[in-house]
Swiss-Prot record:
Keywords: Autophagy, Endosome, Membrane, Protein transport, Repeat, Transport, Vacuole, WD repeat. WD repeats lie at residues 1-34, 183-223, 228-267, 367-407. One of its GO terms (biological process) is autophagy of mitochondrion. This is Autophagy-related protein 18. Component of the PI(3,5)P2 regulatory complex. It is a peripheral membrane protein. Belongs to the WD repeat PROPPIN family. It is found in: Preautophagosomal structure membrane; Vacuole membrane; Endosome membrane. One of its GO terms (cellular component) is endosome membrane. The lineage of its organism: Eukaryota, Fungi, Dikarya, Ascomycota, Pezizomycotina. The gene is atg18. The PI(3,5)P2 regulatory complex regulates both the synthesis and turnover of phosphatidylinositol 3,5-bisphosphate (PtdIns(3,5)P2). Necessary for proper vacuole morphology. Plays an important role in osmotically-induced vacuole fragmentation. Required for cytoplasm to vacuole transport (Cvt) vesicle formation, pexophagy and starvation-induced autophagy. Involved in correct atg9 trafficking to the pre-autophagosomal structure. Might also be involved in premeiotic DNA replication.
């Protein structure tokens, strides 16, 4: 497999291969279309319509109608296409340092966005036509050094690679940037918008902390701990009702977090004293970057305090040191009554309410390089999680919405072979 993705409402699955592409219904799982295009490295669907966007060569995108077997349009770009995003209003094409935004009704180019280098194509476009937001890493301007470059040297990009995890929220309808969310200290590794375009989930390169923010105002609503040690996040996915968030990584555990509980409200950060902030910023940081404070474990929440609140008095620091050996939930609850919400969060990290363990060895295929990658989605019709792995496996797990805990494998499929797991 070269590429795999779910459509916007998770009712279909598209797979790109060296021999073409295939489209499947997810419930019940069945193949509904096969395309014989050679070497499809990207494929994206528009909901359950017959419109698909495919990439076969590095700089070329073809939009075609699978039902009629016709090409709607072809687009060629100045550099390699890294990703495609679309909804019923907009069509976005990501290059390493640019995003091209089109009106999907007539495929007219609306806007070109310059970005920092984004080789991992970190970007999300909401499925909603009303809350039509595009999210991507905030470009970091290049600082002027005064050094003169040779006349024959190619021009430098105005931006450099991000060193922190800030997300720019761009209104793809009005074509204006509307907010910046300071989500993590370390650079981003994965972001996702919910179906309604009202929630943003983020993960940094460290992968221990997952955060959820409101869109477009950028208020931090939830903070979850995926694990203690660093991990590469492959996929973030909300369910259709935005009550669950599913996270896959390079570990064999998939985490499901519940969004329906109390929010971890954060006070709004003060505006910049010089008044130059173009957008309101929601500040929240974690220990993704740098060494953890003394006395904390790997991935500790100790540094997960807004910058404005991070300075503590000697008395408070002494209290932390004296109590670190015996601090439990009950003590944290008592002390929490006297401390700001931002500080008490570090004692009560929200854990997953359900999880999934992927089968060891997957479908038996040997991995060509690196860990088994996975893409996840939550069914829109039942409490089930769908997982697609890079070795060609498609798994369906049932989740107990009351008790949580470990999900139960219900079905699994692979290529021409399919089976139903024992009850």
């Amino acid at each position: 497999m070269n590429y795999v993705t779910f459509n916007q409402d998770y009712t279909c699955l598209a797979v790109g291969t060296a021999k073409g592409f295939r489209i499947y219904h997810t419930d019940p799982f069945s193949k509904i279309f096969t395309g014989d295009n050679e070497n499809v490295t990207i494929i994206e669907m528009l909901f359950s319509t017959s419109l698909v966007a495919i990439k076969q060569s590095p700089r070329h995108i073809v939009i075609q109608n699978t039902k009629r077997g016709t090409v709607i349009c072809e687009l060629t770009f100045p550099s390699a296409v890294l990703a495609v995003r679309l909804n019923r209003k907009r069509f976005a094409v990501l290059l390493e340092e640019e995003i091209y935004l089109y009106d999907i009704q007539n495929m007219g180019l609306l806007y070109t966005i310059s970005t920092s280098a984004n080789p991992n194509a970190i970007c999300a476009l909401s499925a909603s036509s009303e809350n039509c937001y595009l999210a991507y890493p905030l470009p970091k301007p290049r600082e002027e050094t005064g050094d003169k470059r040779p006349a024959h040297a190619p021009p430098l990009s105005p931006y450099v690679a991000p060193t922190s995890g800030e997300v720019l929220i761009f209104d793809a309808k009005s074509l204006k940037a509307v907010n910046v969310v300071e989500a993590h200290r370390a650079p981003l590794s994965c972001i996702a918008l919910n179906n309604d375009g009202t929630l943003l989930a983020t993960a940094s390169e460290t992968g221990t902390i997952i955060r959820v923010f409101s869109v477009p105002d950028g208020q931090k609503l939830y903070q979850f701990r995926r694990g203690t040690y660093p991990s590469t996040i492959f996929s973030l996915s909300f369910n259709m009702s935005s009550t669950l968030l599913c996270v896959s990584s390079n570990s064999d555990t998939i985490h499901i977090f519940r969004l329906g509980g109390p929010v971890t409200g954060m006070p709004e950060s003060p505006r910049s004293p010089n008044g130059k902030d173009k957008w309101k910023r929601s500040r929240s940081f974690d220990s993704d970057n740098g060494s953890p404070p003394a006395g904390t474990s790997p991935g500790s929440e100790m540094a997960d305090v807004p910058v404005e609140k991070s300075k503590s008095t000697g008395t408070f620091g002494s209290m932390i040191r004296r109590s670190s050996q015996m601090m439990g939930k009950s003590v944290a609850g008592v002390v929490g009554g006297y401390l700001p919400q931002a500080v008490t969060e570090m004692w009560e990290p929200a854990r997953d309410f359900a999880f999934i363990k992927l089968p060891k060895g997957g479908m038996g295929a040997t991995s060509r390089s690196g860990p088994l990658k996975s893409v996840v989605a939550i069914s829109s019709s039942s409490p089930q999680v769908m997982v697609v792995t890079s070795d060609g496996g498609f798994y369906i797990y049932s989740i107990d919405m009351e008790a949580g805990g470990e999900g139960v494998l219900v079905k699994q499929y692979s290529g021409r072979r399919q089976s139903r797991a024992a009850s």
